[in-house]
Amino acid sequence: MEVILLDKIAHLGDLGDKVVVKSGFARNYLFPQGKAVMATKDNLAAFEARRAELEAKLADVLAAAEARAAQLSALTNVTIATKAGDEGKLFGSVGTRDIADAITAAGVPVAKSEVRMPNGVLRSVGEYDIVVHLHTDVNTTVKVTVVAE
């Protein structure tokens, strides 16, 4: 199924790109989320009429993400206190929700879906560099320190 993208989508394309996707992906994700429309002559003409508005909206979202990234890079360190054993092994783990809550408490609102932990949850005391993915083009790193209570 050929669709016109109304938003930048990772691993698929940018605003205004005409791409071929599977029907289920279009029907179940792209169309309900408002991220794409079917590639017909009428929709193509309507998109070209709205192109400037959509590009301005996309630029505003990018600027907001860059502003949040600047706030996050201003944070020197985020500390999370949790229960740990004698050797520094945590009772439990520190995951994306814990990190997002700690960063939000430090003054910058972050959703748990924006916190990226490719190596999995943190299970020991120490300092970690955590990637925060704010936009498809904006990533920043936050230093998180896990300490024992």
From Swiss-Prot:
Function: Binds to the 23S rRNA.
Protein family per UniProt: Belongs to the bacterial ribosomal protein bL9 family.
UniProt xrefs under PANTHER family: 50S RIBOSOMAL PROTEIN L9
UniProt name for this protein: Large ribosomal subunit protein bL9
Pfam families: Ribosomal_L9_C, Ribosomal_L9_N
Annotated GO biological process: translation
HAMAP family according to UniProt: Ribosomal_bL9
Coiled-coil residues: none
Keyword Oxidoreductase found: no
Keywords associated with the record: Ribonucleoprotein, Ribosomal protein, RNA-binding, rRNA-binding
GO MF: rRNA binding; structural constituent of ribosome
InterPro entries in the record: Ribosomal_bL9, Ribosomal_bL9/RNase_H1_N, Ribosomal_bL9_bac/chp, Ribosomal_bL9_C, Ribosomal_bL9_C_sf, Ribosomal_bL9_N, Ribosomal_bL9_N_sf
Keyword NADP: no
A GO term from the CC aspect: ribonucleoprotein complex
Cysteines engaged in disulfide bonds, as pairs: none
